Regions:
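ABC ATPase nucleotide-binding domains
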Residues: 226-256
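Conserved ABC ATPase "signature" region
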Residues: 99, 113-133
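Conserved ABC transporter NBD signature motif
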Residues: 61-77
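Conserved ABC ATPase signature
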Residues: 137-141, 145
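Helix-to-loop junction immediately C-terminal to a conserved catalytic motif
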Residues: 53
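Catalytic Walker B motif of ABC-type/P-loop ATPase nucleotide-binding domains
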Residues: 162-166, 171
Length: 256
């Protein structure tokens, strides 16, 4: 029996101010997938995540998350936005930052956290190996520790799906290596979708890959094909696989 997809998108179109951002997107993400969506800056990757989250509505097409509409399933989705969107100088503890991941579930004008919420936050911090930093100010953490705190914030609600937007941008190589170790551990219990503009993403850490630049170019494996990358990046490439995929860009024709 074929597994029901965790994420199912059919013929999705989205435009902004008359400009088509996403064109005819079809996507199936299955349980346990670690799905990487590559593409250039401005190719629609963040927009696609926002559609999956139910933050914006498509012009046409259907989106189903775990069989329901995105807004009905939002509590089952963890979201890690780009790190630069966070103000790490804000005077808040690591635990308080993680607790903020539960704000969407609170009702009323005054939102308070219970002892049970604190237990959830500490569990998420322990999962990321930074429980000992719970009372530290977020501004005092290293870049890698801040990244772990942001991921813990996405995990505090015990999601079934984890979405990550450019998780390795602006981080150093050791932090990037730590991130992929974390990703491997999380993939044992949830479905993961990660978008990035970095074609050098470590393909050995994902199960499937697609390329997005307004249109989505997919291949039902983690193999990057020449057609996929040419379609997304609009640039001829050779793919050479020796354990880890590598790319060689042919010279661009001279500009007139």
């Amino acid at each position: 029996m074929t597994e029901a997809p965790v994420i199912k998108i059919e013929d999705l179109w989205f435009s902004r101010n008359g400009e088509v951002i996403l064109e005819g997107i079809n996507l199936r993400v299955l349980p346990g997938d670690v799905f990487a969506i590559l593409g250039p800056n401005g190719g629609g990757k963040t927009t696609l995540l926002k559609v999956i989250l139910g933050l914006i509505s498509p012009d046409r097409g259907t989106v189903r998350i775990l069989g329901g509409l995105p807004r009905e399933r939002r509590h089952l989705i963890g979201y890690v936005p780009q790190l630069h969107t966070f103000d790490f100088h804000y005077p808040i503890s690591v635990r308080e930052m993680v607790l903020s991941g539960l704000l969407g579930r609170k009702t009323g004008m005054i939102k308070t956290f219970s002892a049970a919420d604190t237990v959830l936050a500490d569990k998420a911090l322990a999962t990321l190996g930074i429980a000992h930093l719970a009372d530290r100010a977020i501004r005092d953490l290293s870049g890698g520790e801040q990244q772990r705190a942001v991921i813990a914030r996405a995990l505090v609600g015990d999601p079934k799906v984890l979405l990550l937007d450019e998780p390795t941008v602006f981080v150093d190589t050791p932090t990037e290596t730590q991130f992929y170790d974390i990703l491997g551990n999380l993939a044992r219990t949830m479905t993961i979708v990660m978008v990035t503009h970095d074609i050098g993403v470590i393909i050995s850490h994902v199960t499937k890959v697609a390329c997005l630049n307004r249109r989505l170019f997919t291949h039902d494996s983690r193999e990057l094909t020449e057609d996929m990358i040419q379609g997304a990046y609009k640039c001829p490439v050779d793919i050479i696989a020796h354990g880890h995929p590598h790319r060689v860009l042919r010279p661009h024709p001279p500009e007139e």
